[in-house]
Amino acid sequence: MSKVIGIDLGTTNSCVSVYERGESKIIPNKEGKNTTPSVVAFTDKGEILVGDSAKRQAVTNPEKTIYSIKRIMGLMMNEKNAQEAKKRLPYKIVDRNGACAVEIAGKVYTPQEISAKVLMKLKEDAESYLGEKVVDAVITVPAYFNDSQRKATKEAGTIAGLNVLRIINEPTAAALAYGLDKKESERIVVYDLGGGTFDVTVLETGDSVVEVLATGGNAFLGGDDFDNKLIDYLLSEFKNESGIDIKGDVMAMQRLKEAAENAKKELSSAMETTVNLPFITADQTGPKHLMKTISRAKFEGMIDNLVGETISTLNSVVSDAGLKMSDIKEVVMVGGSTRVPLVCEEVKKAFGKDLNKSVNPDEVVAVGAAVQGAVIKGDVKDVLLLDVTPLSLGIETLGGIMTKLIDKGTTIPTKKSQVFSTAEDNQSAVTINVLQGEREFARDNKSLGNFNLDGIMPAPRGVPQIEVEFDIDANGILTVSAKDKATGKATDIKITGSSGLSDEEIDKMVKDAELHKEDDKKRKESVDARNGADAIAHQTEKTLNEMGEKIPADLRAKIEAALNDLKAVLKDENATKEQIDAKVSALSKTAEEMYKAASAGKNAGGTAGGNGNAGSNGNSGAKKDDDVIDAEVE
């Protein structure tokens, strides 16, 4: 049976794990690192780079380097967070059927497609590590992700060629990794602050049960926002000093982003750091340099309100669970942004106790996802995971009211139904508008989709009985159905449109991904062939020069001709592996004659050396006589 991998698909970095021989292990990527940057780049040569290689070239290719794609996953263009992302991110965010997408060199990609490229790399790294094909996966999402964001994440997995067995919440996965071996029941809080999202979850763990009591968060708050505070400060300071606004310079902004991220990390251990960006821009007076020293206190002042938001959410979630802060035994810190000292200080202050830092904040979520995969496969038995829906679900009713069918915090999977009626006499159809959120009016909540129930028998208003049923699966993904109880006529909708992709589009993207996979493989083979050919050409040229006149003129001419043919094909960027291999083969054949000539020369030199050695022996004999004479003198 093939193994199940657990994937933490993060805003900034991603991580993959597998459950083997009774424990979850992090799978290193091909670069030897435990985490992979969630970055995808498109080069001018048509290459697609993923991970570290994509991140390294971001400064020189900012408009075609995609990072933080998770921030617009499943978002519609008219949402506030989408507009904020559009202002902040250097690449082009466009409208695709109402949903967010990115445009690179005239081609539109959905967030699902970009995320799929990261997932494909993680999948390939796992296959390389395990030595077998990997299909099944458990992927994590922020607890506060809505239905469309969860659906989009699952679609990304499908496009990447994965069978997504389960979508689980990141804090729940962390708790699963932390609490699996806990025998005594204890209430814990998982405070998860990552690169782009924030979640806090109250759970009860013990005796192989992990039960979510309450959850909350912000799907648009994380380390990126800390970076943005630093960026805004540096932009303002530079403008005040130089009079130049570099906000519109994408390359300068990318340099600034990387510098801000590094400054944030340095301030986690140092009391101050210096941002030094020479030649950031220029005007008629010459080049301009950005240099600014930032203290930890200054940085903490910038992010204080953001950290305060997380503490406010923390208080609300503990209250929603019906608990007091003193009821919490452990506070588990998850996510790279929990390394910021102010974050730890404020959370510690809220609980009045030391924080649990026993888990690796970058890896624990993937570890828990792998445990969940093992539970689904039956490799880990008697573990029960009870998760909850993060937001209430309902429909729009008369007067634009949101009528809730499933309250937030309901354990999933779950199914709830309620009977409604018509608003007008002889109404023959109703439109069901499915909503998610906590506000009283439909317009203030997120619409996940709508569908019609036709063929209702004519009757006075209030008489027809229409049963609406909500069914949430273990992934937190919703299906809604409506039935006219008089006629038995029914219709349903799996909320798929909310992610912006139809089943046909997903199928096409899966095929496109497979097609690109083959193209990438061919391109890599071509690069490997070029590298090998270049090494052979260099070695042949070196040997030619070293041997000089020892190579017969006619043989030298043949080798040089074959060498020039190979160099010519290497200059052609469109040359195929087969064309390169053919020229390498031709050069190798002629070079063999050269190496034979070189070998013959060495053998001849060996014979001469033998005679020389005999002569030397004679000299040695003479020297020996001299030695004897010297001895006699003594």
From Swiss-Prot:
Induction: By stress conditions e.g. heat shock.
Gene transcribed to yield this protein: dnaK
UniProt entry tagged with the keyword Chaperone: yes
Biased composition range(s): Gly residues: 603-615
Name assigned to this protein: Chaperone protein DnaK
Compositional bias annotation for Basic and acidic residues: 515-528
Region (Disordered): 515-536, 595-634
GO molecular-function terms, A-Z: ATP binding; ATP-dependent protein folding chaperone; unfolded protein binding
Cross-referenced HAMAP family: DnaK (MF_00332)
Species lineage: Bacteria, Pseudomonadati, Campylobacterota, Epsilonproteobacteria, Campylobacterales
Organism listed in the record: Campylobacter hominis (strain ATCC BAA-381 / DSM 21671 / CCUG 45161 / LMG 19568 / NCTC 13146 / CH001A)
Keyword annotations from UniProtKB, A to Z: ATP-binding, Chaperone, Nucleotide-binding, Phosphoprotein, Stress response
